[in-house]
Amino acid sequence: MDSDSCAAAFHPEEYSPSCKRRRTVEDFNKFCTFVLAYAGYIPYPKEELPLRSSPSPANSTAGTIDSDGWDAGFSDIASSVPLPVSDRCFSHLQPTLLQRAKPSNFLLDRKKTDKLKKKKKRKRRDSDAPGKEGYRGGLLKLEAADPYVETPTSPTLQDIPQAPSDPCSGWDSDTPSSGSCATVSPDQVKEIKTEGKRTIVRQGKQVVFRDEDSTGNDEDIMVDSDDDSWDLVTCFCMKPFAGRPMIECNECHTWIHLSCAKIRKSNVPEVFVCQKCRDSKFDIRRSNRSRTGSRKLFLD
């Protein structure tokens, strides 16, 4: 079926789906421009306003609208002159597409704003760096200029006279003393310091630690470093007495540190036998057993 018979038969009243007109390049370009304008990528031409207001839009299969209607809507495009190959690729629509796409591309705008924010932050850091260095230098100067300020003591300790060059210090019951106090006569008893529930009392060359109960069982007596027995070595650990609490063995009469004997100050036994004496007794028993066993074998 040729194009003349198809054009003659292409009327709304006498339309049959079997008769179709061949579409040309101009028809395809017109259709594409209409679709782009309908999607909002390019502005509508002035002649196309009645087409857009029509209730039934153009079909993508291109079978319901006559070519005469397209020519009336787009009279500026010459139908007799074929479009070049470059027009088929829609190169003439690229500038308008770019102009319409630039405002809607928010990703590029975000990248630009992020770069600007980073630049501002760098400028702020560079401007704040010399100020911080000057502030640190000022703090160092103030620390070097300020004298050492001692912490104020309690009113009960301020009334106690102390030696200016060699202040008194309280000893821990298990650690050797590092300082010495001014000598006091044996008859005088002076309260030196109060630490929580424990009171440190000095009696001549002895320092007594008393709890709140002030019972004799809770006292820890320590000897001052001025005593001759301070550097005396009696314990098997080969360390001096050094004011630490010790206990005497009932067998060999040697003084042993409570920490070396693994005895707590709150649980000191009345009778103590050191480990060496225990081992010697055990060896004697073993030797006696071996002797009696050998005698029995010899007699048998």
Swiss-Prot record:
Domain of life here? Answer: Eukaryota
How is the protein modified post-translationally, according to the record? Subject to proteasomal degradation. Stable when bound to chromatin. The soluble form is rapidly degraded.
* GO process annotations (BP): cell division; chromosome segregation; DNA damage response; mitotic cell cycle; mitotic chromosome condensation
User: Would you tell me the Gene Ontology cellular component terms?
Assistant: nucleoplasm; nucleus
Q: Where is the composition biased (Polar residues)?
A: 172-185
Zinc fingers, PHD-type class: 232-280
Give the region (Interaction with trimethylated histone H3 (H3K4)) as residue ranges.
241-248
As annotated in the record, motif Nuclear localization signal runs over 110-127
Instruction: Supply the induction statement.
Output: Expression levels are tightly regulated during the cell cycle. Strongly up-regulated during late G2 phase and M phase of the mitotic cell cycle. Down-regulated at the G1-S phase transition of the cell cycle.
Where in or outside the cell is it found? Nucleus; Nucleus, Nucleoplasm
Q: Any keyword Cell cycle?
A: yes
Q: Name one GO molecular function term.
A: chromatin-protein adaptor activity
InterPro entries per UniProt: PHD_PHF13 (IPR041947), Znf_FYVE_PHD (IPR011011), Znf_PHD (IPR001965), Znf_RING/FYVE/PHD (IPR013083)
Basic and acidic residues bias (residue ranges)? 125-135
What UniProt keywords are attached to this protein's entry?
Answer: Cell cycle, Cell division, Chromatin regulator, DNA condensation, Metal-binding, Mitosis, Nucleus, Zinc, Zinc-finger
Signal peptide per UniProt: none
What does the function comment of this entry state? Modulates chromatin structure and DNA damage response by regulating key determinants of chromatin compaction and DNA damage response. Binds H3K4me3-containing chromatin and promotes DNA condensation by recruiting corepressors such as TRIM28 and H3K9 methyltransferase SETDB1. Required for normal chromosome condensation during the early stages of mitosis. Required for normal chromosome separation during mitosis. Increases both chromatin-associated levels and activity of H3K9 methyltransferases, such as SETDB1, thus enhancing H3K9 trimethylation.
Subunit structure, briefly? Interacts with histone H3 that is trimethylated at 'Lys-4' (H3K4me3). Interacts with GSK3B. Interacts with TRIM28. Interacts with SETDB1; the interaction probably enhances SETDB1 chromatin-associated levels and activity.
| Protein name as annotated | PHD finger protein 13
Q: Give the organism's phylogenetic lineage.
A: Eukaryota, Metazoa, Chordata, Craniata, Vertebrata
| Gene expressing this chain | PHF13
